[in-house]
Regions:
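Short beta-strand/loop segment that forms part of the nucleotide-sugar
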Residues: 35-42, 48, 53-55, 60-70, ...
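Short aromatic/hydrophobic "clamp" motif used to bind/position activated sugar donors
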Residues: 115
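Donor-binding/catalytic cores of nucleotide-activated saccharide
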Residues: 99, 103, 120-230, 237-255
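Glycine-rich, basic loop-to-helix element that forms the pyrophosphate-binding segment
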Residues: 94-110
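A conserved acidic beta->alpha catalytic loop
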Residues: 24, 31, 67-76, 98
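Short, well-formed alpha-helical segments that are part of the catalytic scaffolds
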Residues: 14-52
């Protein structure tokens, strides 16, 4: 049976999370929330024989666990799935090279028509996965964008990150996406994107290795070359947040600013290929890259508790940015001035994210409602 979807799982010291993630790929004939919990429990206890697998779907799915030099029992956890479902689960071992390196290696091994990356500490909605495999079997677009949801472990709360398009049965280009930006932006991310394997491999693009934040690169540069894109409303990916040990925590982000800077300048190399991008590709690239640079400003100027140091870091960054890309430097100046003002006023990151950012989101929703009303 040919594979329809390949899931790449970059894995490094994820022993305590991996079982939940891998068990979420066990599509059963009766797939609901209760079944998913049962599957996770059975897998934890090694009682795979009690899981009522939908073989027709599992035969079309490939799950590649890329062992990025892990030092814990992650491989042992994954091996149990390989032993029971050798036609679906596979382990690829490599020396440690970071998240981007693990994705690059995973791409070399995919056999599916489409590929998606799911982090080892996250999981998927199993019923949505079943629907996705069935859907991908009948489309050929360069990329698919799917709604996802956040799970905040500190609050035990889910929050949707949904996309909205006029017709979920239709196919869109990047110019369309730019025109629908606020309605689809949440899905234009690492957690929302699914690539056609043939399209992705033909680009020959390699993600930055030995750094954090290359997920921004993954969702930006290859996607800027997509000629055809489809959207799925049902939420698939469950993105776990709220863990102070995660790389997305404020302290970790400040510490890893040099990584983000390296990724930004690697992304900017794609400017040399604007002529190869399809209609709307350049505009998409500018908007997405502006967002990445804006996140750099937020981390350095707002999340960094040493405000003076943050200003000095950004001044050096802006000098390099102006030299590298006058286009992107001009594109982000208004946002930079806002963040610099917030820095001077000692606006906290919690205020920015809980108050100011919410006002911006409300404005977007009002605009979205107005557009729907005018139709």
């Amino acid at each position: 049976m040919s594979k329809i979807l390949s899931i790449i799982i970059p894995t490094y010291n994820a022993e305590k999370f991996l079982n939940k993630g891998l068990s979420s790929f066990l599509v059963c004939r009766d797939t609901d929330a209760q079944t998913a919990q049962h599957n996770c429990k059975m897998a934890t206890e090694g009682r795979f024989e009690e899981i009522d697998i939908d073989k027709a779907i599992l035969d079309k799915l490939e799950v590649i666990v890329v062992n990025d030099g892990t030092s814990d029992r992650s491989v042992e956890v994954a091996q149990k799935f390989v032993d029971w479902y050798p036609d679906t689960f596979v382990i690829v071992n490599k020396t440690n090279g970071g998240h981007g390196s693990a994705i690059n290696t995973g791409v070399e091994h995919v056999r599916g028509k489409y590929l998606k990356v799911v982090d080892a500490d996250d999981w998927v909605d199993t019923l949505a996965l079943k629907h996705l495999v069935e859907y991908l079997e009948h489309v050929d677009s360069d990329a698919v964008i799917q709604s996802f949801r956040y799970y905040d472990i500190s609050k035990d709360e889910y929050r949707p990150a949904d996309v909205s398009v006029p017709d979920f049965t239709g196919e869109y280009n990047l110019k369309d996406i730019v025109n629908m930006w606020d309605d689809v932006y949440d899905g234009l991310s690492f957690h929302g994107v699914i690539y056609n394997t043939g399209f992705y491999k033909a680009l020959g693009y390699k993600l930055t290795e030995h750094v954090f934040y290359e997920d921004q690169e993954y969702a930006t540069v290859p996607f800027s070359y997509a000629k055809t894109v489809r959207f799925i409303q049902e939420e698939l990916y469950v993105y776990r947040v709220g863990d102070v040990n995660q790389s997305v925590s404020a302290a970790s982000q400040v510490k890893r600013l040099p990584d983000l800077e390296q990724v930004i300048f690697n992304v900017l190399e794609a400017e040399k290929s604007f002529a190869k991008m399809p209609q709307g590709g350049k505009e998409h690239f500018i908007r997405k890259t502006s967002g990445i640079i804006t996140s750099y400003y937020q981390i350095a100027l707002i999340k960094n508790t040493d405000r003076q140091s943050g200003r000095a870091i950004v001044e050096q960054f802006n000098m390099k940015l102006a030299q590298k890309s006058a286009l992107m430097y001009e594109a982000v100046q208004r946002k930079y001035k806002v963040f610099r003002l917030f820095n001077k006023l000692h606006v906290s990151n919690s205020f920015y994210e809980n108050q100011f950012a919410k006002l911006l989101e409300l404005a977007k929703r009002v605009g979205r409602a107005d557009r729907l009303y005018r139709k």
